[in-house]
Amino acid sequence: MSEIIQDLSLEDVLGDRFGRYSKYIIQERALPDVRDGLKPVQRRILYAMYSSGNTHDKNFRKSAKTVGDVIGQYHPHGDFSVYEAMVRLSQDWKLRHVLIEMHGNNGSIDNDPPAAMRYTEAKLSLLAEELLRDINKETVSFISNYDDTTLEPMVLPSRFPNLLVNGSTGISAGYATDIPPHNLAEVIQATLKYIDNPDITVNQLMKYIKGPDFPTGGIIQGIDGIKKAYESGKGRIIVRSKVEEETLRNGRKQLIITEIPYEVNKSSLVKRIDELRADKKVDGIVEVRDETDRTGLRIAIELKKDVNSESIKNYLYKNSDLQISYNFNMVAISDGRPKLMGIRQIIDSYLNHQIEVVANRTKFELDNAEKRMHIVEGLIKALSILDKVIELIRSSKNKRDAKENLIEVYEFTEEQAEAIVMLQLYRLTNTDIVALEGEHKELEALIKQLRHILDNHDALLNVIKEELNEIKKKFKSERLSLIEAEIEEIKIDKEVMVPSEEVILSMTRHGYIKRTSIRSYNASGVEDIGLKDGDSLLKHQEVNTQDTVLVFTNKGRYLFIPVHKLADIRWKELGQHVSQIVPIEEDEVVINVFNEKDFNTDAFYVFATQNGMIKKSTVPLFKTTRFNKPLIATKVKENDDLISVMRFEKDQLITIITNKGMSLTYNTSELSDTGLRAAGVKSINLKAEDFVVMTEGVSENDTILMATQRGSLKRISFKILQVAKRAQRGITLLKELKKNPHRIVAAHVVTGEHSQYTLYSKSNEEHGLINDIHKSEQYTNGSFIVDTDDFGEVIDMYIS
């Protein structure tokens, strides 16, 4: 035997072989045929059971026998894959109408594996036999099996639209399919209407076929998605569980789930909901129980007293498989190729298949009727000359000679002569003659009817309609899935997602933020906070985990951080830098932080910059749903910095102090509310080379503490300040010196909450009590606190 060696590139060989493989798995494995809705392995299983007599009216047989028949005759693949496909056809949570009845453990909605095939027993369901009905009447084409030892059908007659009724799911090379199951009665009714009017629109079809009907029930939302899928083959719907509310004896409520979305694993759903409870992702759930038994599916979610059950339900819809998106992708094999098909195309392909099936069956029955008619006519003729026929047969040598004599003497045909010589003596009675004549009339009528069906297309369609109506009447069932027109927007109260807990919020001047339990805070004390060298506490306060923190930076931006998203860190430990929560620029500095409980308020923020700009914006403007990046709070011009952010419940006085010792006080009522992207208006009329060092709210019981670069502290009372108008130059608070004049590097309004100050020089920190600093007159430079010759100039001051 000579070898043929081909010189081919690896690229060409791989491309060719993968192309063949792809075509094979598309056509022979993963995608259903539009005509019978079956993949090849499913078709082979059903045909093997039918041809071996494993039908609904017989006893159950071991599944292993069927698997062996399928592998041995039609499907030379692994036994597990065949058994898996067989089991799926018996699972009433996967198929709207099961095609195989199975005794024994056939898996569960919890995705438990079925018992081994040697333990389970199966037989065809009654409805499955409608897929195979008339297969022995030459209704469909047969091809040789894999080893040419027998024949198998290319497609089943499929006397109902199985593709739509039971749906299909599968993945192949370059293609996937997701066709949902539907209600059998609705699908048949839509098919009947399509037969009556082939130009019927999708909208008109949807009067009869409302949408998918999942075996697990559930609630389907989104008629627009259904319509889009029925028109184009692709669409999206929402499927949510059926949830009811019950009240227990102790007054608590519980959510009862009796239906879940299609192909959702029940045990995984229960586990997920319980994880949300255990991880405190949702507050208000006491216990989650799977109470499913033989009476049906039931999941109980017991709630705490006085919780918002609707919000908990909505949270679970959004964060578990209690609600899912189902995406239609109606791809099926049509004319040997995968096609994305709308519902009209699917029904049309099915109808064309039925026309062919009924026509082939009618031809088969007509041929048999005509053959029988021919025999009956021969028998009637023979009985009319019975004595002569008997005499001729008795004088013949054998059966063959008798047949030849009948053909030659009385002009019977070969078939008629065969029937005559095979006729038994007891049939030669008057009763039998009458019966033959009656049969002859019936055959005449049948042949006439069959020819009419073949010659008249409308008559053929009427046959299809009658048989579909019979199946509808016999197998119809109520719809399981409820359809709602609109997709409901899920609204979740924050109280449901986050357990309410009072905690301590802290922010350092270097940007380290954390939340700490009250217990940890009380066990340590304020002074024991974890800090890096050179850092200090900017603010700390008691907040709730359901609150929101707004962190403002010198760039005029703010970070929106829900308190519950902050790391829970002990008071003595270092916090988390804000840049790890929301990315900020390297030179961006935190200047203030505020806590918001409710953005629906009349409160407002005031923003002041170093170059003397000021702006007022209401709190509700700062509410957002974006947590992942900094947001604009105010526009800060080039070469300027935001130095102060204040929050007020109502209009009040603010004081501005500049580096050269100027001060201006006016009411925030002079500021108009502006948007977040506005830069604001002029706050104070600055001298040349002067800049703002402080803008803070002030009241008549407050004092102001100022620090100069020369190490001096000056404290003045509110009465020195003069209330004026915005954008004026203000009053002078320092005595001007010709040589080495004092310049204010920091200033703060001192309220009853403040008792200490900290002065920072280049190489030293100086701490002291604010009350030790006596109040000064307007035109003084205060008292020297730091020796700048030893420690350098003062650069900053904080109060606490």
From Swiss-Prot:
GO CC term (a single one): cytoplasm
Residues covered by the Topo IIA-type catalytic domain: 31-495
Q: Where is this site: Interaction with DNA?
A: K39, H75, H77, R88, K94
Which family does the entry's similarity section mention? Answer: Belongs to the type II topoisomerase GyrA/ParC subunit family. ParC type 2 subfamily.
- Organism of origin is Staphylococcus aureus (strain MRSA252)
The residues responsible for catalysis, as annotated, are Y119
List the membrane topology term(s): Peripheral membrane protein
Please verify whether the record's keywords include Membrane: yes
The record ties this protein, via InterPro entries, to: GyrA/parC_rep (IPR006691), Gyrase/topoIV_suA_C (IPR035516), Topo_IIA-like_dom_sf (IPR013760), Topo_IIA_A/C_ab (IPR013758), Topo_IIA_A_a_sf (IPR013757), Topo_IIA_dom_A (IPR002205), TopoIV_A_Gpos (IPR005741), Type_II_DNA_Topoisomerases (IPR050220)
Protein name from the UniProt record: DNA topoisomerase 4 subunit A
The protein's predominant localisation is membrane
